[in-house]
Amino acid sequence: MINILNAIILGIVQGITEFLPVSSSGHLLLFRHFIHLKLPIIFDIYLHFATVLVIIIYYRQRISELFSTFIRFSLRKTNKSDLTNLKLISLILIITIVTGVVGTFISKYERMFTLPFILINFIITGILILMLEFKFFKIDFKDNILLVGIFMGLMQGLGAFPGISRSGITIFSATVLGFNRKSAFEISFLSLIPIVFGAILLKHKEFYDIFMVLNFFEINLGALVAFVVGIFSINLFFKMLNNKKLYYFSIYLFALSITVCYFV
């Protein structure tokens, strides 16, 4: 059973790490490992839902623009100015489908999600961030929406592995394909929205179970904390982005992995 303190801490962990390229799922599992707390995966999805609300608020104007474009497209009243938004909508749709397929496959191997596996993935994420920060290589495929969507969907799907940062790997793949950082972050965060809502729809029956098995108050407290902390976290992330200091996250992940290996 989860208590109030655990709910608050898990909410803080989720709120901070969701928007930072350090893997929120990896940190949640790491924390639960040390306090010997076992929770159903649907609890993590509920926390992700709380932080997705932060994304919706942060990008509310952009989402409104995309929704308006989609309505005009449905009514066949689009114009040339809608072309960019239609491409983004198409890209997010392809990414969502591919991610869903990959994520469903990976979810069948949850027994692999051991502590050493998570730590190795932390290191991989740290390396990807360094490659992103210092622009190790770049190819220009951004105009081919289908290929970009498939590639980014595959990469985002790998983010289902705890320790592999979903935002980190999608931002990395977007920049490799020729997108600038601002566009890469936008695609990464907006593509998370349908993924989380899709996961909720697929596991909607399990939501009833967690409210029956776990404490209703503690579950919602954790989600509320994740939401509030997430508001501050997303602003911190974009501030560090503007200052071009993402490599700090690589240093953190390397240090965390080494420290945990040493003491465990």
Swiss-Prot record:
This is Undecaprenyl-diphosphatase. It is an enzyme of class 3 (hydrolase). It catalyses: di-trans,octa-cis-undecaprenyl diphosphate + H2O = di-trans,octa-cis-undecaprenyl phosphate + phosphate + H(+). Belongs to the UppP family. NCBIfam families: PRK00281.3-3, undec_PP_bacA. It is found in: Cell inner membrane. Its EC number is 3.6.1.27. Catalyzes the dephosphorylation of undecaprenyl diphosphate (UPP). Confers resistance to bacitracin. InterPro entries: UppP. One of its GO terms (biological process) is peptidoglycan biosynthetic process. Bacitracin is thought to be involved in the inhibition of peptidoglycan synthesis by sequestering undecaprenyl diphosphate, thereby reducing the pool of lipid carrier available. The lineage of its organism: Bacteria, Pseudomonadati, Spirochaetota, Spirochaetia, Spirochaetales. Its main location: membrane. The gene is uppP. Pfam families: BacA. GO terms for cellular component: plasma membrane. It comes from the Bacteria. It is a multi-pass membrane protein. The chain crosses the membrane at residues 2-22, 39-59, 86-106, 112-132, 145-165, 182-202, 210-230, 244-264. Keywords: Antibiotic resistance, Cell inner membrane, Cell membrane, Cell shape, Cell wall biogenesis/degradation, Hydrolase, Membrane, Peptidoglycan synthesis, Transmembrane, Transmembrane helix. One of its GO terms (molecular function) is undecaprenyl-diphosphatase activity. It comes from Borreliella afzelii (strain PKo).
